[in-house]
Amino acid sequence: MTTSATSGTGPADPAGPTENSMRRALKRARDGVALDASEAAVLLQARGAHLDALTASAARVRDAGLEAAGRPGVITYSKSVFVPLTRLCRDKCHYCTFVTVPGKLRRAGHGMFMSPDEVLDIARKGAALGCKEALITLGDKPEDRWPEAREWLDAHGYDDTIAYVRAVSIRILEETGLLPHLNPGVMTWTDFQRLKPVAPSMGMMLETTATRLWSEPGGPHHGSPDKEPAVRLRVLEDAGRSSVPFTSGILIGIGETYEERAESLFALRRVSRSYHGIQELIIQNFRAKPDTAMRGMPDAELDELVAAVAVARHIMGPSACLQAPPNLVDAEYERLIGAGIDDWGGVSPLTIDHVNPERPWPQIDELAATSRAAGFELRERLCVYPEFVRRGEPWLDPRLRPHVAALADPETGLAREDAVVEGHAWQEPDEAFTATGRTDLHATIDTEGRTSDRRDDFDEVYGDWGALREAAAPGMAPERIDTDVRAALATAADDPTKLTDDEALALLHAEGPALDALCGIADDVRRSVVGDDVTYIVTRNINFTNVCYTGCRFCAFAQRRTDADAYTLSLDQVADRAQQAWEVGAVEVCMQGGIHPDLPGTAYFDIARAVKERVPGMHVHAFSPMEVVNGATRTGLSIREWLTAAKEAGLDSVPGTAAEILDDEVRWILTKGKLPAATWIEVIETAHELGIRSSSTMMYGHVDQPRHWLGHLRTLAGIQRRTGGFTEFVTLPFIHTNAPVYLAGIARPGPTLRDNRAVTAMARLLLHPHIPNIQTSWVKLGTEGAAEMLRSGANDLGGTLMEETISRMAGSSYGSYKSVKDLIAVADAAGRPAKPRTTLYGPVPEERQRAARDSDGHLPELLPVLD
């Protein structure tokens, strides 16, 4: 038997699968063997008895998953209201009737957006009927296409559509008790940070990975920038990185081939396995609508849908939650149950399906009866799936916990039958800082060490290690090139600003005598630019908390709040440490911390203000770009507004940490939820524009290669040419010992001595003449290693630190502080004089120098600071 190789609406393919290939694929599915994309494409074409066999095995997979999840024989749904916040959109999908134009809205007497009162009216009526979900759906970025949308947002005080979505969501939570499930289309990483605190779940259909349906004229997505598959896959990745429970799925029957349909499912599986964040997969069948460009296309046939559901179940596995919208079939619900679904999606007793208005939702009693006839019990869930309700952090923002807890059964995570749907205050944590946990870590890390080499949720918080190993494989061993570096050395010696990328890359690979020559050239450039003085700063690190759920895979500092080594300092403790530092000659405190979900929205302002009030003369060097973004999203301010407010609170400069490698290819292996490279650059450039100087950094020697170092340094040089705001460049060799990405067998064990010398020397040359100060890290390299870098182009030793927990938690063995005499000794070892400096590389007042000399720049005793 042979069948057509295309869907009922797809372009013609060669002859379909043979009987043997179908039987072989069915056997593999029946036996639970992993399918590949070609086998999935074969099974998508199963019909008749073959389809019956396929659905039977898919149902068994589904049943095993429900048993493992503790809800055997249960099919779920969400009782919801549909809120079409705006029907304007910048896209032009050829099958869509949801989207309209401003003129039609005006003629119908509607605004460009629903008003808050209109939204709340629907939500209140839904709450009265027992609904618990507000499905907020809207067009993509309408203000980018329609001036009327931009004017509406401006008139109502919103910077963009996402800001309005956030504001409306808060009002729904506070005034009705419904939980927002957000479908605003394509979102950026920053958008997720803004919306995560106000919505337990979000969603966006992938639809298809068939790029031709977007790129070719006449395709269903042609002319729609937000329907490019690569863009939509990036959204799914960003949702996973941000630990947002996310709903996605495919739309079948819009012209894709079976192979393309299979690839779309495998793309969803890849994201799901990498981040474990896809809470629900929707298999949606195309229904042609009048007054659209695709009105003549045939609907996807029922067998197409049933086969797609069954194949999706086999590909995604037993733990996946699989939905097919019940209003898009004609009462053939039992076939969808038989194919492996375990959810009916959102069903509203109040509102229509505004995307498919011609297809009314079935009554909940009807779904219950159909489910019961198939041997299943219909149970209500929340918009956020039970697994994520039970997991809690980092998937549920602390600000949403009380809202979800009011509606969820604590044992099952499903909706509570007796829940009263009513509003609850949504607010940032406003309790004062309280000291918790191991607040003596800064003192005891050197004597007692850390309690464990890894946090308790090691196997969960960082995503799927297997998927990461595949992505990181090219960087496990840096590539080596066989290049004559003589010409490159000659260029560097003559004028390092003329180095081409090929020459620079050759020098980054230099070894032996060539490396010695490179370091000599860099040292000559250093001498001509900043002289022989080795600068240092008397400073204290204050890491005010190590509680963090971001999931950076290189970081051994971050802990869950319940881990043995977790701690948070009070504001008084922060101020006490700053005062102690001042008394022994410090001119700066460097303050950074984990992204603690319970800190109040004003936390960073409060910290800066506490130090300035206690020690007015202290320079506050604080808050990485990641913390800046966190502060901005939590306060609802733009990055510029937040930095301005932080400056007013006492912030003097920002550390250029959280840069790692400014290449997202590497960045998304190293970090799970940290900001993208473009956002780091935005924060730094905005700070510079506001007169807030910063350092710059690069962490290297993990899953990166020299080409990444080159790109990173070129990026920093470009920023400095534009802003002039960098004070220094700091090399940060990767400390591997306790780093999760190393413990999982993915990263290299840090850079070699060759790497350190080459990076230091090339930083001097590639950043010349824009960034004159190159700092080496005694914390990471020790005194001998730091002295070697001073002979390779570096001119600065960093600070006394007084306490250091980040590198020590990672496994650095070089201690937590250095005295002034210690740092002078390092400079002596390099044959150079030492000189104190300020954060901005200015002269240190004599009074500060005297205090440092009298104390030797370190505390009399490093003991826990108690209230």
Swiss-Prot record:
Q: How is the cofactor bound?
A: Binds 2 [4Fe-4S] clusters. The clusters are coordinated with 3 cysteines and an exchangeable S-adenosyl-L-methionine.
Q: Which GO terms label this protein's molecular function in UniProt?
A: 4 iron, 4 sulfur cluster binding; 5-amino-6-(D-ribitylamino)uracil--L-tyrosine 4-hydroxyphenyl transferase activity; 7,8-didemethyl-8-hydroxy-5-deazariboflavin synthase activity; metal ion binding
Residues annotated as region CofH-like?
511-844
The residues covered by the Radical SAM core domain are 75-325, 534-769
Domain of life, per lineage:
Bacteria
Where along the chain is [4Fe-4S] cluster 1 bound? 89, 93, 96
Q: Which cofactor does it need?
A: [4Fe-4S] cluster
InterPro entries named in the record: Aldolase_TIM, CofG_family, CofH/MnqC-like_C, CofH_family, Elp3/MiaA/NifB-like_rSAM, F420, FO_synthase_su2, rSAM
Residues that coordinate or bind [4Fe-4S] cluster 2: 548, 552, 555
Q: Does the keyword Lyase apply?
A: yes
Bias kind Basic and acidic residues: ranges:
845-859
Note down the stretches annotated as region CofG-like: 76-407
Pathway membership of this protein? Cofactor biosynthesis; coenzyme F0 biosynthesis
Known catalytic reactions: 5-amino-6-(D-ribitylamino)uracil + L-tyrosine + S-adenosyl-L-methionine = 5-amino-5-(4-hydroxybenzyl)-6-(D-ribitylimino)-5,6-dihydrouracil + 2-iminoacetate + 5'-deoxyadenosine + L-methionine + H(+); 5-amino-5-(4-hydroxybenzyl)-6-(D-ribitylimino)-5,6-dihydrouracil + S-adenosyl-L-methionine = 7,8-didemethyl-8-hydroxy-5-deazariboflavin + 5'-deoxyadenosine + L-methionine + NH4(+) + H(+)
Q: Which UniProt keywords apply?
A: 4Fe-4S, Iron, Iron-sulfur, Lyase, Metal-binding, S-adenosyl-L-methionine, Transferase
Any coiled-coil regions, as ranges: none
Q: What is its EC number?
A: 4.3.1.32, 2.5.1.147
- Region annotated Disordered sits at 1-22, 835-867
Role this protein plays: Catalyzes the radical-mediated synthesis of 7,8-didemethyl-8-hydroxy-5-deazariboflavin (FO) from 5-amino-6-(D-ribitylamino)uracil and L-tyrosine.
Q: Which family does it belong to?
A: In the N-terminal section; belongs to the radical SAM superfamily. CofG family.
Task: Report what the protein is called.
Answer: FO synthase
Q: What is the organism of origin for this protein?
A: Streptomyces coelicolor (strain ATCC BAA-471 / A3(2) / M145)
As recorded in Swiss-Prot or TrEMBL, the protein's gene is named fbiC
